[in-house]
């Protein structure tokens, strides 16, 4: 016995030593790859190594990437050591890029094999004998969707019309199987919930699901359930009768695909194949897997119950049920003990899921064209339809709005009068879910437009170019690069209005608008945004876009680097729902989770997830809740780390060879005091380039007036700086080649500046007006002033007595329209009047006068309100904003600006009239 024990210890020691040697060998190889290369390639390889370091905890023992290193995290997955098809698709993309840099594509191959083994249900998980019982003439039984979880279970309706599935037979004929080749979206990697593989309660990983009960069901209101429901766990009918009403229930399997993840996997495989050829590596067998996945992904192009698009009360007869877009899901299932099956598409389409890059690959690349008779043609149609979809949804500002549905309210209800449509499908501000609204998250903007930018890079399609030109202009106006080296990107967006009904031509959507309601530092979204900007910059030659991408990458790296990757602190206000969110369970229903947690009316999120009580971060959560505070966490999401790594690697690929030609400036930040005025000197290292000019916003400074060039020294004149509003301005040094550079200057006034004019009796308050322009383009068909009105006095001010004036040149006298997109006192309480001035002055022949209704109330001492305005000419002809007196091209957030005037009871109290 002693000898055996010693032998075992020796073997364990040997394995441990081999592991250390392999890790050291890998580090040595990576050091060799990165040692003489540019910093962006080095960053990619550093992050790749940290993601693969077992001590950092990104991967399970099965080699599956977790959603996050941390376990206490609730978003789409409700536990950190679940994973998603999204994470798996990023895994492929990461390894494709690693192969590009090192020539080693074995990690990419392993990623595909992991997907096939664990994420695509095997024949054991979706028995072919059951799937062979599917009838494409009767794909599934209709069940209406409802808004609230409390309206479930949803009763099956066997009499409702259901159309014909036109692709099933050709898929069976092409691939010789009845099973579906697509990823299920959610995996319990370590079997935390305890359902097990095929309900054995033990094995891992296990296919699970959560969302099932309508648009208002947040993750906090879900009941986790197994995909293989043999009725032995849960209640008397397993979990089935929580969701669907039927006369009797059968043991069954059911899986849901997230189409954006499968599309990303195909996109990643395309680039892996291109880069592998550079190294003489053959990836043809993995290309075939991606092609096959794309063939089945066509199910996402069809209405949920294969009803006609635009005539959704009628059953479809084939392709008349195809919207040709990437919808929110497709799903399938069948009997465990009986041979029957069903397949559904999805009626709801989100702009954030579209992928014209993947559509182009599957339609045009001979290696990727699906083997089925109609696969490539369907993807060619999808490409055209997706590009139209983006055009239809692009707001007046440039952001992409939500999406459309062929099943209004999820029940194929008649469309209300006046709703905008796309091929007969109704506009939806937030497709699929409303808690929170699905298109509030800025990340969808970055994700979806990254694919458009990549497609533009590959094809030069002018439709993509036009979409990106407008979108990137909007991005430049809303991303903040602060003078202290920090950055902010939009966090949440708010939408108003709707697009024009689609007739085949983009109208500019004058009635569809977006505003930013919060800012943050979502690192994954910032990485994806940088990726999009880089592809756009490379193709269009827009160096300002490249510089913005570079700033995001550099600032993330400098601010948020840690020993596991990158992470920013997150304040989680929603975590109060751990304790307070009741999960709806129908009266009379009772059952248990695998660990014994009771499922019954009145339970909370935590009640049916009691294993969280043993999580290492739970005491922190509990303490914050007891103190009435929102806890702050640092997370390492796998997809976000990949997005950052990939963006850095992409910078190396697209611009790495140009590093030696970059120019530099010193300093990159400075301060100008209006009370102690001095020129600012900047030293330039040209590296063979020439300075084309210096830009403030979209306008160039005047050499010899605003600045002087004296060899390697640029002098920014104090006279120019004195004319700027207090706050922060950015000056872009535009070089003939390589990177442009940005000088950030804080404008301060230690002398206090000009005193605002005191109002006359009877009102004693004093107003301070801060403002900025949401659209700083030189030429634009819309002017978008933003105002913050602050009462710095000691008495209340009736807002109905307050007026603001924004001065501008009309540039072609036409009738004009004003809109209040948002106001903290309610948009309906804001008025806008256009006044033609008796005598034109420099920068002004008109002013917009903002007023307030009596219902707006009063502005109390120390309080402020915000107004987001917008105006345009009735024929949408352009304004030249740089000529306008009140236009501020440099501010991207609220700053004091005395070229906006304010009046109380007709008396000037703030600002300088032109």
UniProtKB/Swiss-Prot annotation:
Any single Pfam family the record assigns to this protein: CBM_3
GO biological process annotation, one example: cellulose catabolic process
One Gene Ontology molecular-function label: cellulose binding
Keywords: Carbohydrate metabolism, Cellulose degradation, Glycosidase, Hydrolase, Polysaccharide degradation, Signal
Domain CBM3 positions: 763-914
Reaction(s) catalysed (UniProt annotation): Hydrolysis of (1->4)-beta-D-glucosidic linkages in cellulose and cellotetraose, releasing cellobiose from the non-reducing ends of the chains
Signal peptide annotation: 1-33
InterPro entries: 6-hairpin_glycosidase_sf, 6hp_glycosidase-like_sf, Carbo-bd_X2, CBM2/CBM3_carb-bd_dom_sf, CBM3, CBM3_sf, Endo-1-4-beta-glucanase_dom2, Endoglucanase_F_dom3
Enzyme class name: hydrolase
UniProt EC number: 3.2.1.91
SUPFAM superfamilies in the record: Carbohydrate-binding domain (SSF49384), E set domains (SSF81296), Six-hairpin glycosidases (SSF48208)
Family membership noted in the UniProt record: Belongs to the glycosyl hydrolase 48 (cellulase L) family.
Protein name listed in UniProt: Exoglucanase-2
Species, as recorded: Thermoclostridium stercorarium (strain ATCC 35414 / DSM 8532 / NCIMB 11754) (Clostridium stercorarium)
């Amino acid at each position: 016995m002693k000898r055996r024990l010693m032998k075992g210890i020796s073997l364990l020691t040997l394995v441990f030593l081999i592991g250390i040697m392999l890790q050291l060998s890998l580090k040595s190889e990576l050091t060799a790859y990165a040692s003489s290369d540019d910093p962006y390639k080095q960053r990619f390889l550093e992050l790749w190594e940290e993601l693969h370091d077992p001590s950092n905890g990104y991967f399970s023992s099965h080699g599956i990437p977790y959603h996050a290193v941390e376990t206490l995290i609730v978003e789409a997955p409700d536990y950190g050591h679940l994973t998603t098809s999204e994470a798996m698709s990023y895994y492929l993309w990461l390894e494709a890029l690693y192969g590009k840099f090192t020539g080693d594509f074995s990690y990419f191959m392993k990623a595909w094999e992991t997907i096939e083994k664990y994420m695509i249900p095997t024949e054991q998980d979706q028995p072919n004998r059951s799937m062979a019982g599917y009838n494409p003439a009767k794909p599934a039984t209709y069940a209406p969707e409802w808004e609230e979880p409390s309206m479930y279970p949803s009763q099956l309706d066997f009499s409702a019309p259901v159309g014909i599935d036109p692709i099933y037979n050709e898929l069976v004929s092409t691939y010789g199987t009845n099973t579906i080749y697509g990823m299920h979206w959610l995996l319990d990697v370590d079997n935390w919930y305890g359902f097990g593989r095929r309900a054995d309660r033990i094995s891992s990983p296990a296919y699970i699901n959560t969302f099932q009960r309508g648009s208002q069901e947040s993750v906090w209101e879900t009941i986790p359930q197994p995909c293989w429901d043999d009725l032995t766990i849960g209640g008397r009918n397993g979990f089935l009768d929580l969701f669907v009403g039927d006369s009797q229930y059968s043991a069954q399997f059911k899986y849901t695909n997230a189409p954006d993840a499968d599309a990303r996997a195909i996109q990643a495989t395309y680039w892996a194949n291109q880069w592998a050829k550079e190294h003489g590596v053959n990836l043809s067998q993995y290309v075939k897997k991606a092609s096959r996945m794309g063939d089945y992904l066509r199910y996402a192009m069809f209405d949920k119950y294969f009803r006609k698009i635009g005539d959704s009360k009628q059953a479809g007869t084939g392709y008349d049920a195809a919207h040709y877009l990437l919808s929110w899901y497709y799903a399938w299932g069948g009997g465990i003990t009986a041979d029957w099956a069903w397949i559904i598409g999805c009626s709801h389409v989100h702009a954030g899921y579209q992928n014209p890059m993947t559509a182009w690959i599957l339609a045009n690349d001979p290696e990727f064209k699906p083997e089925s008779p109609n696969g490539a043609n369907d993807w060619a149609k999808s490409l055209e339809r997706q590009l139209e979809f983006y055009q239809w949804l692009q707001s007046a500002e440039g952001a992409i709005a939500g999406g459309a549905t062929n099943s209004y309210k999820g029940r194929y209800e008649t469309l209300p009068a006046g709703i905008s449509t796309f091929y007969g499908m109704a506009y939806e501000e937030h497709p699929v879910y409303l808690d929170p609204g699905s298109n509030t998250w800025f990340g969808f903007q970055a994700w979806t437009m990254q694919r458009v930018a990549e497609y533009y890079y590959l094809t030069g399609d002018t439709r993509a170019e036009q979409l990106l030109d407008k979108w990137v202009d909007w991005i430049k106006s809303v991303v903040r690069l602060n003078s202290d080296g920090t950055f902010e990107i939009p966090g949440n967006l708010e939408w108003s209005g709707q697009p024009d009904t689609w007739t085949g031509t983009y109208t500019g959507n004058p009635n569809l608008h977006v505003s930013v309601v919060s800012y943050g530092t979502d690192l994954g979204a910032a990485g994806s945004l940088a990726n999009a900007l880089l592809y756009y910059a490379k193709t269009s030659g827009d160096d300002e876009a490249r510089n913005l991408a570079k700033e995001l990458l550099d600032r993330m790296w400098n601010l948020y680097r840690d020993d596991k990757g990158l992470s920013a602190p997150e304040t989680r206000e929603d975590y109060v729902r751990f304790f307070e969110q009741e999960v709806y369970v129908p009266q009379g229903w009772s059952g248990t989770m695998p660990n014994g947690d009771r499922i019954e009316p009145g339970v909370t999120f935590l009640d049916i997830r009691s294993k969280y009580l043993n999580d290492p971060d739970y005491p922190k959560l509990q303490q914050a809740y007891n103190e009435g505070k929102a806890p702050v966490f640092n997370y390492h999401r796998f997809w976000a780390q990949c997005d950052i790594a990939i963006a850095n690697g992409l910078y190396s690929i697209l611009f790495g060879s140009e590093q030696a030609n970059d120019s530099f400036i010193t300093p990159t930040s400075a301060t100008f005091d209006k009370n102690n005025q001095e020129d600012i000197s900047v030293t330039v290292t040209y590296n063979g380039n020439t300075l084309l000019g210096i830009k403030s916003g979209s306008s160039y400074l005047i050499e010899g007036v605003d600045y002087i060039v004296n060899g390697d020294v640029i002098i920014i004149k104090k006279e120019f700086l004195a004319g700027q509003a207090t706050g922060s301005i950015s000056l872009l040094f535009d070089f003939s080649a390589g990177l442009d550079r940005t000088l950030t200057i804080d404008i301060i006034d230690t002398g206090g500046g000009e005193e605002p004019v005191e109002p006359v009796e009877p009102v004693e308050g004093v107003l301070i007006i801060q403002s900025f322009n949401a659209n700083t383009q030189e030429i634009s068909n819309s002017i978008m002033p933003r105002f913050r009105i602050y009462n710095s006095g000691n008495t209340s001010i009736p807002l109905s007595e307050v007026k603001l004036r924004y001065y501008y040149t009309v540039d072609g006298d036409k009738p004009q329209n004003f809109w209040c997109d948002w106001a903290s006192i309610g948009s309906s309480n804001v008025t806008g009047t256009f006044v033609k001035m008796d005598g034109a002055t420099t920068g002004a022949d008109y002013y917009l006068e903002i007023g307030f209704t009596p219902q707006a109330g009063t502005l109390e001492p120390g309080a402020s309100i915000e107004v987001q305005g917008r105006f345009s000419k009735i024929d949408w002809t352009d304004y030249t904003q740089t000529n306008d007196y009140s236009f501020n091209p440099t501010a991207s957030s609220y700053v004091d600006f005395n070229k906006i005037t304010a009046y109380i009871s007709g008396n000037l109290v703030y600002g300088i009239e032109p």
